[in-house]
Amino acid sequence: MDRLDEIVGIRGQKAIEIVGRAAVKEIGAGTKGIKADVSNLQELDSLYAAIKAEYSAIDILVANAGFDILAPLGAITEEQYDSIFDTNLKGVIFTVQKALPLMKSGSAVVLIGSTASIQPGSMMSVYGATKAGLRNLARSWIEDIRGSGVRINVVSPGPVRTQSLYDFFPDDKRDEILAFLETKSTVGRLGQPEDIAKAVAFLASDDAGYINGVELVVDGGASQV
């Protein structure tokens, strides 16, 4: 593929301005940010209408939206549950379903899961449940669209050095927790965003043309030992 235009769906106009500038700098002028909350089906419709009008088709879809709210059993609220499930599971279901009419044979879908689907930490039960759900969506969906030529796979990262990971921990405990997480990795370090991007790029590429319905765990082996 000689040229790749990238559309980034982003929740919130201010985030579009910030992420959009960074994406254009890193990826190039073919990048565009469009406001879209994946839990809002009308905003998804607007997103895909804009893509159809300008590009007519989607070759690669990466369903990356997701977040967590830490809460132990006994303190989980309905509001927390609904917000996590609306984004992490409902959002993914309709992100993919509404994209399918724009995808042709040879296209690829990559769902971003998490090793929390198999090893959720304390206070991560709701988040872990949504990520386990993604794994089973992929298993079922490849049967639903059998013969379409569209592949669906999952990339499940472990801890990755991003701002969202740093913000997840209290300031006075952050370095200690990150050091502990690093010891869990059998390659001696935490993941970098580039590690996940390379895994996604592989599963979306023609090199993975005979790979369908798998979960590729990218965590330095931490969940395997």
Where in the sequence are the language-model features?
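The beta1-alpha1 cofactor-binding region of Rossmann-like NAD(H)/NADP(H)-dependent oxidoreductases
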Residues: 36-46, 78, 194-195
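Substrate-binding pocket helix/loop in short-chain dehydrogenase/reductase
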Residues: 72-73, 77-85, 181
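Active-site helix of classical SDR
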Residues: 96, 130, 138
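Alpha-helical segment proximal to the catalytic Tyr-Lys
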Residues: 101-102, 143-147, 209
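Residue(s) in the substrate-gating loop at a strand-loop-helix junction
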Residues: 114
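Short C-terminal tail/terminal secondary-structure segment
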Residues: 119, 201, 212-225
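Short, flexible catalytic-loop segment of classical short-chain dehydrogenase/reductase
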Residues: 135, 152, 157-167
